[in-house]
């Protein structure tokens, strides 16, 4: 085969990119798991670069591990979001060396203290960096497009 993409260097570069994309998918899955584990601030913050930013675009951003932990800890203590389920789909991930970008569709459901079920529809725009050899969030931005109560009577 004469195409460059099939020579050893081309194959190794393509394999590296596929491995990077898979590592980023797993990073996002770990983020969702941390959120769904009663908003475990330690677990979520550990997924970010030390000065990484978590930002729900409806509120002020949280910069750095301490701010991210505090934000998620406040959600946990308040009990305002229980039994959450973050479902992300349709990822578009572009890797460029030790940095990458990603866009994900989001569907989240949760229950509030009055046992009402809520649904959030939106998307994430993320930037990632390879930090000490491991993919981490540089910036995670959540954009909410719809926020609605599914069952106001708790049924």
Model-identified regions with their sequence ranges:
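Short, well-structured alpha-helical interface segments that form or flank functional binding sites
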Residues: 26, 63, 123
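Short, low-complexity N-terminal intrinsically disordered segments enriched in polar/charged residues
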Residues: 1-34, 41-42, 46
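A solvent-exposed, acidic/Ser-Thr-rich amphipathic alpha-helical stretch
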Residues: 40-106
């Amino acid at each position: 085969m004469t195409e460059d993409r099939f020579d050893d260097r081309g194959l190794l570069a393509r394999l590296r990119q596929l491995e990077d994309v898979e590592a980023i998918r797993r990073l996002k899955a770990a983020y969702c798991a941390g959120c769904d584990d009663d908003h475990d601030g330690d677990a979520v913050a550990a997924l970010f670069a030390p000065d990484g930013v978590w930002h729900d675009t409806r509120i002020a951003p949280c910069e750095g591990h301490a701010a991210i932990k505090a934000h998620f800890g406040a959600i946990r203590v308040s009990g305002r979001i229980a039994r959450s389920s973050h479902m992300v789909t349709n990822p578009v991930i572009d890797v460029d060396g030790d940095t990458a970008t990603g866009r994900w569709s989001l569907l989240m459901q949760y229950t509030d203290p009055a046992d009402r079920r809520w649904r959030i529809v939106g998307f994430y725009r993320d930037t990632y960096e390879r930090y000490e050899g491991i993919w981490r969030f540089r910036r995670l931005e959540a954009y909410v497009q719809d926020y609605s109560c599914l069952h106001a009577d708790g049924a």
